[in-house]
Regions:
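Bacterial N-terminal signal peptides
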Residues: 7-15
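Cleaved targeting-peptide boundary
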Residues: 21-29
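Positively charged n-region of N-terminal signal peptides that target proteins for export
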Residues: 1-4
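Compact alpha-helical subdomains of small soluble proteins
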Residues: 44, 48-102
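N-terminal signal peptide c-region/cleavage motif recognized by signal peptidases
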Residues: 17-19
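Extracellular/mature segments of secreted proteins
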Residues: 36-43
Length: 102
């Protein structure tokens, strides 16, 4: 699972951040990325079909529009997990921690 998280995190960081960010910008970026992860996790818990997740998540977005590009990537990552793992883990906290560690 960690390899999958790292690969997804790297791809998402490239998609949204571009050049190296200053510390505060990095924190903001990681916070928005974590919000995307939390929204996708909630969609999975609400049993939204995988193909309907992008529209459902974008409708409730609380982050800048540029972070919407990560929704398909995060969706596939969350939906390949077992439901018990999605239920018992705080995926957004794990994502944010790994993002800040980069």
């Amino acid at each position: 699972m960690n390899k999958t998280i790292l690969a997804a995190l790297a791809a998402m960081s490239m998609a949204v951040s571009g050049p190296a960010l200053a510390a505060s910008k990095k924190e903001d970026s990681c916070m928005h990325q974590a919000a995307v992860v939390a929204a996708v996790q909630q969609a999975r818990l609400d049993r939204v079909k995988e193909r309907e997740v992008p529209a459902a998540v974008k409708a409730k977005a609380t982050w800048p529009e540029s972070f919407n590009t990560a929704i398909p990537l995060v969706t596939s990552w969350v939906y390949e997990m077992k439901m018990r793992d999605v239920k018992k883990n705080d995926l957004s906290a794990a994502w944010k921690e790994m993002c800040l560690a980069q």
